Amino acid sequence: MLMQVEKKKLLSQADIPTKFDPINYLGEYLMRHNTHYIKDPGVSGYQRVMKEITEELKTHVPDTINNRISKMKEKVKEKREQREYISTVKVKVAGMRKQALEEQFNEWVLNPKGMIPIVVYISSYITDLKSEVFEEFLKHLCHSAEEFREIILTDMRRQMFAELFLQCDSGKVMALDRQRTLALLEAFYDQCSSTTRSLLRNPRQWPFVEFEEIELIEFWGDMDIKKHIYEDFDALLLKMNMLVAEKLAGKLAENKDLPQQQRDQELSSDSTTEPETATQLTSQQRSRRVSLTGQGQGKGPRKTSASKQGASRGSVAEQGSRRSSGVNQTQQRGSVAEQGSRRSSAVEQTQQRGSVAEQGSRRSSTVEQTRQRGSVAEQGSRRSSTVEQTQRRGSVAEQGSRRSSGVNQTQQRGSVAEQGSRRSSAVEQTQQRGSVAEQGSRRSSAMEQEPQTAQDPNSDSLPEQESHRGSITEGSHRGSISEPGQRRASVTGQRRKSSVDDSGSAGSRRGSGTDQGQHRGSVGQRKGSGERKMSASEYGPHQESITEEPLTASEPGPQIDTIQELDEDSTPQLEDDSALKESKTSELTKIETQEEKPLLLINEEQVPRDSKQPEVPTSSKKERPSGSPKKGRLSGTSKRDSQKDKACEPKPQHVEGKKWSGEFLICDWKIKHVKSEEEEQAKLICDDTRFTDLHATIRNFQTYKGIKGRSAFNGVSLDLLQFVQLLETFVGEDTSFSLSKDLASFFQKNYSETKQEKIKALEQARQNSSRIRRRILLQAIFEKWDNDGSGFLDLNEVDDLLYTYKEGMERESMKKAKLHINFPEPSPGHEVKLSSKQFQRYIELVVSELRGNEDEVLESVVEFLMGSLERSHVEGLRNCARRKWLHQIQYAAETSGVSLEPVYTETFRVLTQDAEAHGNKKISAHISLLEENVFLPERGHVLLRNVACTLDDAPFVLNKVLYRDMKGISFTVVDEGKPIHVPQVQHHGNIFFWNSFRSKNEYNGSFLALPLQDAYMRIFGVLAVDTLRDPHEINIFLPHEIKFYQGVANAFSTAYHHVHSREHVLHSVMTGIRWLFSVTSGITTITTCFIEPSSEQEDYVLRNMMVTDCLGLAEIHTDPPTITRNACIFRDFLFKCTDTSEVILASSGGETHIAIPLRQRTKEAMGILDVNIGRSRMLLYQEYKDLQKMVKMIQNVSYEILGEFSGEIEKTMVIEMESAGEVKRAGILFFRTMLQELQECLCLLDSMDFVSLLLYEHKYHVDSILQDITLQEVEANVALVHDVLKGVILFSQREKDSLSDLEEWEKWKFHINKYLVEEICVLDPTASNVEVNVELVTSYIQAHSRTEVWNFRNIVIELLYHWINICLTLIELNMRQDVSIIPPLPKKSATSIYAISSERSIREKL
């Protein structure tokens, strides 16, 4: 220690701090030189190794800590490696999917920049998709690309027609003559060839011709099928069906003498020979699958062995690119080969344990058994081979390279033998289930089979599809069917090479067993490189897949069994592959027994067409493969798929030889070409300095304008939208773009107007602009005058101000205007109130009596009134706010989805907002509606029910009833029709307080009751407002508040009737649709939508109110979903219909739609009927005419309902049943309107039309000879005539006593005369004095169908048949006490801040 101190010179540096600690140093020295420490001499290497081995062996001792820790480490390591592997596979799959998307999007038409950023966007959503779903998604994108191309082509066509319109509009009035346009379309239609005419739409028929332009006799009695919108559509369809029926009947006759098993095979194989592109048939034929009908001689127990049944199971032969494997499959223990990650295959099993041979590599063919020992190929007339198998169960043989091995199995379940390399061996397996044998490298195995049936001498030899072939096996009593060439479905299996594991296994497993019966059994799958690589969607150069094609369904048999499984053992193999293998689900249908086999359905497109007959499409052009995308085949699956699914074929970037500009005309052509005349005139007035005080008012009500962007149909002229749509409807979707060019060229050459016509058109345009300008000015001056928003002006006040015009010089002239106008009846105070429309009419009459140009005089009068009405800035702001609030009530009604709840809510919100903002009050309010007093008539004929109120008053007011014998002033308001204001309710003795818990000291406030009036000034309810909850001592309503509350009552009345008018229209639509479905069968669904204004940038939206299916079951949405224009680019035909107010025929998603507008009285569309007719190109002519009848009746009913609610027409009661109530009347208006039209049409008939029916039975022999009608048909026609006439006679009320004993037809004939016709033309079947034997009439009519009546082709029978059915329907409805169809009820929302009654008012108004 001292030596260290001296060495470090620590003694000389005593004053310097140091880190040297002598104690620590001394201790360390002593520890290092401890004499008692003995150093370990060490161990040998042998001892060290043995010790390590011992420690390692301890980990294998069960139930020890080391053992458990070792197992945990192994599992952790295994899971970590698995996660790393899965992550690597996901990266590979994501890369390949991205590449597939990039290749797929080359199908889309690119914009000028040549980029589609959506590829990157979609890539983030497909990461977790299964392989099958991803391929279906790719196919969906293919069809979307095809539809997108069609949209571009349609946009190009519409742009060409728009340019044509501008060229033909030489006067620049933005209108073309409609009749001249239709005449040119007829001329172009007539000069076209028959082939072209079959693709065009007939311009002489509806929808080109309106119902008002068709005579009644022609509308109801024209049954000439040649006048269909598609020329000879019915005849062509009937001819095709007859040819198919004859072909099928001949085939059945040929097979009658064949054995049952062979006959079934022939039928089933024949059904697969037809093209799989049929798109127009019944719902059973919409999927591209066909049921095979190979059947045995009987049904045996499912679990009996092959030896007991004397038959073996069938097999599914699945062939790879360079090898093929035979698969034996049973009904209960069959197996299915499933390949790769996320691949699945479905195998159909018959009730006789039959089998289906399927083969791949872009073709379908029968798999010929390999040239090995003991195999016999048996071929049928359809070149199908059947090979008999020994009594073994479920064995699978796999083929190597030019060697074969047999696998013998005992009666176990689903075992599979695994083979070695380059040698043939037989392995017997027992007591094993679900094992999978796979072979390493290029070897093929063939199952040895003992021939049990001789080869058919008439069978043809099967050509070899590849160098190696699979086999088809079947038992002696169980048949299998396979179709050659393109007439057979196949299962294509392709495998890739895989490395052999070091442990000696045959290779990592790529396939998984999929159980069909007892979920036991398997199919061995082998891997190997193929001669041709195929995939449902090709990702890269090394990509392969299993492709299994479904068959076309020819019978509705059992449902398809599809099983999809994911093989967990396939994940290690993916690491060795450079590309992902995809597989397509094989869809096979079950085989039915002979007893249950239905007749094959007729497919239109299976008929061989005549060489002279043009190929007329009978289905939608834009049709996808039938069924959902899941049922369709993927692009690239096979050669036949690519031929059928043209949407998945490569497409050029040019459309009709032109590169797309990247812009759509339909998106902005309204801005460029379509201008609102009202907006233009409003802009001109706002630029005029003479009307400065009206500018703010005009801007306000232009902002609050309702629905914009619709063209009204006027029947005289066509604007740009209507012209383009008319031409687009004419050319249809099946014509070429060149035909549209020819049509445009034809129009440009032949459309011309004379000088007088141009001058007349310009004059009409000027008058229209002047009329709109006058209306805007008068509406603005009315709103400025009505500063408090009451909705009315006092006539005396208006006269007093008008008479001062020009210092009274025009006083006498103005008084003359009162002689030409009918003012409303004066109120009890002798005041005449003018509404906005009445005020405008009155001023126009006053101006017409003054000297000078009417437009200049009117502007002078408006300028005078504007200067005479002085309003302060505060009054102007208050007027602006109140106008906005009143508009919100109407807006709530228009966007309510036919519900009153939003109207009630918005009404109370407006009342409370105005009371707080302009009166500094807290109010309570409730709405009472008049109802008929049914239960207590002694307390008054009517009662007032509180249907809505503010939330605080709900426990005391809501749903309470006020009778006439109770205290209150509400019935006084109802009787007098004017508001009543009680300033202090505590001093009034006739006020009824709903809250009985309130003390009399709290009865401090004002009460105001206002009448609710309809368009005819009839009272239907009361709006009550009070200030009992206001804390202020003085809370009296001021005059401007009372006037505004009158405006609120008026706005609520308008909104209330708006909702109920739409509700009644919806009620009538439902009735009409149900009638249509009762007489037609070709319509799938009918969707009813109403137009509503939009709060967004769009002009309007559609609300899906109701969907009715073919059974007449209607789904009514209480909260209807909204359809926006931007969200339905592939279904834009709905908005085309509402934009133009014209009928649209379009295709969407492979289905044909007929979009029919529901027009309001201004001829603008207020709704739409979307008629879906499925995959048919068009309805039959009879159904098409019945659709027209339904549409015409609904439109007439809508005009009547809307006119009654708006006050434009008076309500008329035609039949007695209409007085039963508003709701019930709305439900029968459709039948009443049809009854009226039928009676009017019967009156137009000549007497000889009825006489010819009486003589029909005497000339039936002549008809049978001249018209080539069989005797049975003539007798059926005679029975039809007799029964219809008997049914009509039974409605006669003049001689009903003499009709009871009639038995022979000779006695019935005496009652058919002109008096009977006159009687049925005015008969009211619902009258109380009309007595009809309904059961007897029904017995005569119900035996005859609608089709039978139509085929008779007689207008009298047609009219009488409909007349009888309508009368019976009205009688049935009249006998019911309740309403058979209830319109949608107002929804009740829990989030509403106002209370609304859940019970519906009957609304029986006085």
Swiss-Prot record:
Residues 564-577 have a biased composition (Acidic residues). Residues 773-808 form the EF-hand domain. It comes from the Eukaryota. SUPFAM superfamilies: GAF domain-like (SSF55781). Residues 255-655 are annotated as: Disordered. Ca(2+) binds at D786, D788, S790, E797. Residues 258-294, 322-334, 342-354, 362-373, 382-393, 402-414, 422-434, 442-464 have a biased composition (Polar residues). GO terms for molecular function: calcium ion binding. Keywords: Calcium, Metal-binding. Residues 501-513 have a biased composition (Low complexity). Residues 465-477, 578-598, 638-655 have a biased composition (Basic and acidic residues). InterPro entries: EF_Hand_1_Ca_BS, EF_hand_dom, GAF-like_dom_sf. This is EF-hand calcium-binding domain-containing protein 5.
